[in-house]
UniProtKB/Swiss-Prot annotation:
SMART domains: Ribosomal_S10 (SM01403). Belongs to the universal ribosomal protein uS10 family. GO terms for molecular function: structural constituent of ribosome. GO terms for cellular component: mitochondrial small ribosomal subunit; mitochondrion. It holds the Pfam family Ribosomal_S10. One of its GO terms (biological process) is translation. The gene is mrps10. Component of the mitochondrial ribosome small subunit (28S) which comprises a 12S rRNA and about 30 distinct proteins. The keyword Ribonucleoprotein applies. The keyword Nucleus does not apply. Signal peptide: none annotated. It is found in: Mitochondrion. This is Small ribosomal subunit protein uS10m.
Length: 187
């Protein structure tokens, strides 16, 4: 009962502070551990510097493929959830998220070094994969996304990134060859 009354008093004091009945200094006046400093926050911050624009156009990627591999399936499941959630929050269009088949590497050794060929030990390493494909992404968005997911890459997980860029067709290819070889009309 005493604990609930103390919580009720604390809530009442906090509500008075938020509604403007108390000032910040008088609200903490009864606490001896708190210093009697009042911090003021300016409402208006100075204007942020202007956004810089570069002259060169941003690179466009048709597809960004991120493949991660590791030995622990649960870690890859968690990282896949994190990477897809990050892509959705950044507004990127997820084309496909899939799990390629795992690779199993088996190693068979003798238990004893020199004798007893019938007694063997078999070791197995399983490598699990996850692939996340993002379509139609700009170069700046790709850099931000990749930096974010690479900084949060768990231990024991490797990442491979494949970018497929969209290029402008050169003018000598755009112009059809049959336009150059038109027979001249004889009059």
């Amino acid at each position: 009962m005493a604990a609930s009354m103390a919580n009720f008093r604390t809530l009442r004091v906090l509500s008075k502070i938020f509604h403007g009945h108390f000032t910040a200094a008088s609200a903490v006046q009864h606490h001896t551990a708190c210093p009697r400093l009042v911090h003021t926050v300016s409402v208006f911050s100075p204007p942020s510097p202007a956004i810089t624009e570069s002259e060169e156009p941003d690179t466009l990627y048709q597809r960004l493929s991120v493949q991660v591999k590791g030995h622990d399936r649960a870690v890859l499941d968690s990282y896949e959830f994190f990477a897809t959630l990050a892509a959705k929050e950044l507004g990127l269009s997820l084309e496909k998220v899939f799990e390629p088949p795992k690779h199993i590497d088996k190693l068979t050794l003798l238990k004893s070094r020199h004798i007893f060929k019938k007694h063997r030990v078999q070791y197995e390493m399983r490598t699990h994969y996850r692939c996340i494909q993002i379509s139609r992404i700009t170069g700046s968005s790709a850099r931000v996304y990749l930096e974010y997911i690479q900084r949060n890459l768990p231990e024991g997980v490797a990442m491979e990134v494949t970018k497929t860029a969209m290029e402008k067709i050169p003018e000598h290819i755009q112009k059809p060859l049959w336009d150059d070889n038109k027979p001249e009309a004889s009059g």
